[in-house]
């Protein structure tokens, strides 16, 4: 029969390789049109041609649970069990991304934990877009690195239960695997080296540029005192020019000043002269007292003249 596994096939994980796919899905694949027409009589060499014709990945879809061509070819490879070198060439093929994914799927189902990490982790650097068909028959956009990440960490992929994998940390401690080096780490190292070179180029420029004047610790620690209003210094001519102009006196004040000046200008002058004369003369205080208490002879003669006139009348 066409659905039997080849005679010289080895058991995988202690069972028939075709039994890695669930029985319900396996029977749906056997009944599908693609399996009967395209997968009949395929060998390891002819599978490559069919893999190059793939346009999307996926498991089963629709209400009738129809399998995708990707799932049919996966079961066919489990049936014929190609050699490991052929699968490695599938994975290393960079021209056809769906051929690469088909080889990665087969390696994940049949390979050991060490082989899965060794051959699938380099595909993390493949960021090409792929189409994936979901259960409703709708297409979704994915990337190759996303598909590989799900293969290594998910429990189910393309409606197939994936075998258990040992943790990478355990394999590293057993020295079966080397620590993984990410492509991002290499890019970061290149960026750091370029930044260090730029810093070294900038250092001589900084040494040549003069340093700005620094204040002494006294200037920094001592708080600045604002000048007291009582002993302020006179403003410089620049500050005077910048200071706001004084307000012009009101017209009422000007009138009061004019009245005060116009009252007795001669009187003010005579008083100022008398004060200067008194300050110069030594007997100023005595003469002032004498004048205030004693009457002058002229005033006496005037009074006697008035009395004589009254007597004659």
Swiss-Prot record:
Compositional bias of kind Basic and acidic residues: 203-224
Region (N-terminal protein interaction domain): 1-179
Tagged with keyword Coiled coil: yes
GO cellular component: nucleus; precatalytic spliceosome; U2-type precatalytic spliceosome
Biological process, per Gene Ontology: mRNA splicing, via spliceosome
Start-end of Acidic residues biased regions: 184-202
SUBUNIT field: Component of the spliceosome B complex.
Family the UniProt entry places it in: Belongs to the PRP38 family.
Entry protein name: Pre-mRNA-splicing factor 38A
Organism: Danio rerio
């Amino acid at each position: 029969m066409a659905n039997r596994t080849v005679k010289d096939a080895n058991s995988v994980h202690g069972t028939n390789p075709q039994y890695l796919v669930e029985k319900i899905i396996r029977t749906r694949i056997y009944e599908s049109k693609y399996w009967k027409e395209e997968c009949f009589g395929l060998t390891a060499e002819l599978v490559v041609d069919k893999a190059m014709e793939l346009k999307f990945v996926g498991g089963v879809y629709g209400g009738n649970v129809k399998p995708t061509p990707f799932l049919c070819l996966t079961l066919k490879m489990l049936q014929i069990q190609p050699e490991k070198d052929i699968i490695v060439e599938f994975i290393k093929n960079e021209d056809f991304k769906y051929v690469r994914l088909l080889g990665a799927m087969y390696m994940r189902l049949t390979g050991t934990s060490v082989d899965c990490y060794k051959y699938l982790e380099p595909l993390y650097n493949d960021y090409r877009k792929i189409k994936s068909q979901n259960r409703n028959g709708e297409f979704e956009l994915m990337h190759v690195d996303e598909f590989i990440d799900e293969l290594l960490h998910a429990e189910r992929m393309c409606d197939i239960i994936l075998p258990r994998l040992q943790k990478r940390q355990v394999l590293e401690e057993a020295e079966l695997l080397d620590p993984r080096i990410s492509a991002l780490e290499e890019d970061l190292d290149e960026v750091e080296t370029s930044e260090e070179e730029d810093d070294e180029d900038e250092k001589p420029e900084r040494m040549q540029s003069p340093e700005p004047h620094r204040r002494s610790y006294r200037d920094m620690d001592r708080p600045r005192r604002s000048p007291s209003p009582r002993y302020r210094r006179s403003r410089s001519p620049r500050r005077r020019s910048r200071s706001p102009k004084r307000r012009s006196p009101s017209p009422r004040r000007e009138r009061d000043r004019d009245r005060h000046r116009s009252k007795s200008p001669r009187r003010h002058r005579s008083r100022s002269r008398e004060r200067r004369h008194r300050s110069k003369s030594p007997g100023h205080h005595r003469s002032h007292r004498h004048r205030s208490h004693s009457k002058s002879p002229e005033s006496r003669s005037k009074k006697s003249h008035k009395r004589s006139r009254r007597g004659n009348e």
